[in-house]
Amino acid sequence: MAAEREPPPLGDVKPTDFEELEDGEDLFTSTVSTLESSPSSPEPASLPAEDISANSNGSKPVEVVLDDDREDLFAEATEEVSLDSPERELILSSEPSPAVTPVTPTTLIAPRIESKSISAPVIFDRSRDEIEEEANGDIFDIEIGVSDPEKVGDGMNAYMAYRVTTKTSLSMFSKSEFSVKRRFSDFLGLHSKLASKYLHVGYIVPPAPEKSIVGMTKVKVGKEDSSSTEFVEKRRAALERYLQRTVKHPTLLQDPDLRQFLESSELPRAVNTQALSGAGILRMVNKAADAVNKMTIKMNESDAWFEEKQQQFENLDQQLRKLHASVEALVCHRKELSANTAAFAKSAAMLGNSEDHTALSRALSQLAEVEEKIDQLHQEQAFADFYMFSELLSDYIRLIAAVKGVFDHRMKCWQKWEDAQITLLKKRETEAKMMVANKPDKIQQAKNEIREWEAKVQQGERDFEQISKTIRKEVGRFEKERVKDFKAVIIKYLESLVQTQQQLIKYWEAFLPEAKAIA
């Protein structure tokens, strides 16, 4: 019936129309009386609008008549929902109350202090995160470079030393720019110290580059050739990326061992870093034992977030390994293409020298020069494939292993807490047996043990909650850094591909007139 009736013009709305609406207020008397804490409003003209907004759910004609003023009506209605001194809210506050959506009367008259108790921690967390991001911006004001690889010593006692240069404006360092000499074992020793301090409490410690016995043996005993030079450059770049990722971590940057590594001219010799040593074999045994324990521990995961993230990192690890294998194959094919292009250029040059036709001989010689330039382009692109893309994938494969490592430590922490609960239950059963057997001398001992294990259970619960909280924060930071790193590398990689193709076009366009000049 309301849809069939013609809506009157907006200018024809009279106070009588509002009086007809106000006749139905007795249906919502309790709600309106509850919301209105004072009978007199500072603005009398707003009273009809407030009544209409309160009853708009039950009368369609009102919505049709006042369609153009709907925004004003709802704005005034939202100002009335506050129970914290309504007169003061109407006079001083121009912002809408948190309760914006019209709901049931019981929800509308809920005390406002409840909404404050929910929103206050969120605001506090947000401001704390903003402060931390600002602090991280200052913390990241540090540049680290690894350069000048130098062979020290002869024979199997030789090692490579690298210059670590640091530029920073942070007050924690004594100078704004300094450099030190470090060998590869020093980097491994630094990672070992940081991992022993922070890994078991949930921090993701960037892994150091892996040792290569074959590559380093060739550098020690062999002469300088292309393979040795490539190995040294690959290790130098990996060490530089390792330090850059480490100093980006706000907690690790504060560590005294890291500052000593960057500043001290002399470091104590790092021990237990050799691959073929007793400590190295012990590490391998411990890794195998951890793998077995991981299979035997059945953790009842109650947090869906951790279960989802673990599955996500497992899938990401598999896909990264597949992509890394494909990129390595691409690098090999690109190097093979470069070698074949060089052979083609040499053959074209020899053919041009033996050709009697002058124009054809000149064109073949020019073709050989172009192919030599293209050979150089293929080599540069192969290096870009490797150092830009392949090494990034390799780094993140090892970083994901570190992420899975902190998940394993969380599982160990849960297992320790679970074992403490089981032991406490056994102690209480023992106490009950002593009381039944009426052995007062052992009852007191059992009570002391119960108090001891209750403290261990509480500590285990606190440790588990803390490591879970830390891992959540660390995974969030890791995801942001991962997206940022992949974006930067993909853009650089695409730019290198575009530049290579553009250079190829220039080479062939320059050669085209020589080919057309053959008569």
Swiss-Prot record:
UniProt key word Iron: no
Alphabetical GO biological process terms: intracellular protein transport; lamellipodium morphogenesis; retrograde transport, endosome to Golgi
Gene Ontology MF: a single term: protein heterodimerization activity
Annotated stretches, region: Membrane-binding amphipathic helix: 278-295
Domain BAR: 299-519
Positions of modified residues (N6-acetyllysine): 469
CDD domains: PX_SNX2
PX domain location: 140-269
Function: Involved in several stages of intracellular trafficking. Interacts with membranes containing phosphatidylinositol 3-phosphate (PtdIns(3P)) or phosphatidylinositol 3,5-bisphosphate (PtdIns(3,5)P2). Acts in part as component of the retromer membrane-deforming SNX-BAR subcomplex. The SNX-BAR retromer mediates retrograde transport of cargo proteins from endosomes to the trans-Golgi network (TGN) and is involved in endosome-to-plasma membrane transport for cargo protein recycling.
Assembly notes: Predominantly forms heterodimers with BAR domain-containing sorting nexins SNX5, SNX6 and SNX32; can self-associate to form homodimers. The heterodimers are proposed to self-assemble into helical arrays on the membrane to stabilize and expand local membrane curvature underlying endosomal tubule formation.
Annotated PANTHER family: SORTING NEXIN (PTHR10555), SORTING NEXIN-2 (PTHR10555:SF31)
Protein name per its UniProtKB record: Sorting nexin-2
Source species of the chain: Mus musculus
Gene behind the chain: Snx2
